[in-house]
Amino acid sequence: MASFPCPIEETLLPVPCKVNLRLAVGARRPNGYHDIDTFFLPLPEPADVLRLRRFDGPGDIDLQCSDPELETDDNLVVRAYRAYAAATGYAPRLEVHLAKHIPHGAGLGGGSSDAAVMLRYLNDRADEAALSPVDLAALALTLGADIPFFLLGVPAVATGVGETLIPADPGLAGWCAVVVCPEARVKTAWAYAALDASRALPQKPGANLLTTAFDANKRAFCVTGAPMRNDFESVVFAAHPELGRVKERLLALGAAGALLSGTGSAVFGLFRKRQTATLALAMLTGSGPRAYLAPL
């Protein structure tokens, strides 16, 4: 009878997502990246789950995923593993199952967060080959601009292409976020190209950054002194008007502020009271799109 090796360790790790409380996009750099000024907020829901089985001796990574289309060498989990192995020489034999719950193409950073969890897992077990936090963040940046934030794991203001991080308190303790994930998918490259193209056109005066229901006096909901803002809303909502309607719906249901996350398609609302957020969640899920409640 054939015998099968037993893992020396089996680990189950949650993978959080993020939203952007602010996302201002600057000029395009020669390397294709854009300067940004953003406020990242990690959320516990929706969340992926990584199950890792580590075997004795060196090897490679075998990835299985609840979405078979993501079982490729281009998956950021695989790329993170191989980048870490190339940088440190630490390459344990791993069987990885990725339970995918963070929607792809939603602006919630699911793939980047998956990669950050893999990098942290490897670094915690690499002993003398382990990288310093600075070197680990530098390696993460080669894989994706927001992966260093997920390594940091706390609310932070990010500038540059996202690599310069300053931990910050958004002042939302006790609040709840409701994250709505419509079926639409927005490609990041398209969103940046569309934004660049729109800026080449004559601009209308008085761009409206209002994110609250206070239309009468134009009071903008603020987080640490800056209005909630996402420069991508103009182009993304024009291409996907249903996403703009989700934002309006969140505000109508009592959100103090609402915004597109990243390049979309997810839209989130911030609620002062859990009861109001729970009711909004029930109303939204009854109308179709997936929605999640995340305590802050």
Swiss-Prot record:
The active site is at K18, D146. ATP binds at P103, H104, G105, A106, G107, L108, G109, G110, G111, S112, S113. Pfam families: GHMP_kinases_C (PF08544), GHMP_kinases_N (PF00288). Keywords: ATP-binding, Isoprene biosynthesis, Kinase, Nucleotide-binding, Transferase. It is an enzyme of class 2 (transferase). Catalyzes the phosphorylation of the position 2 hydroxy group of 4-diphosphocytidyl-2C-methyl-D-erythritol. Belongs to the GHMP kinase family. IspE subfamily. This is 4-diphosphocytidyl-2-C-methyl-D-erythritol kinase. It comes from Solidesulfovibrio magneticus (strain ATCC 700980 / DSM 13731 / RS-1) (Desulfovibrio magneticus).
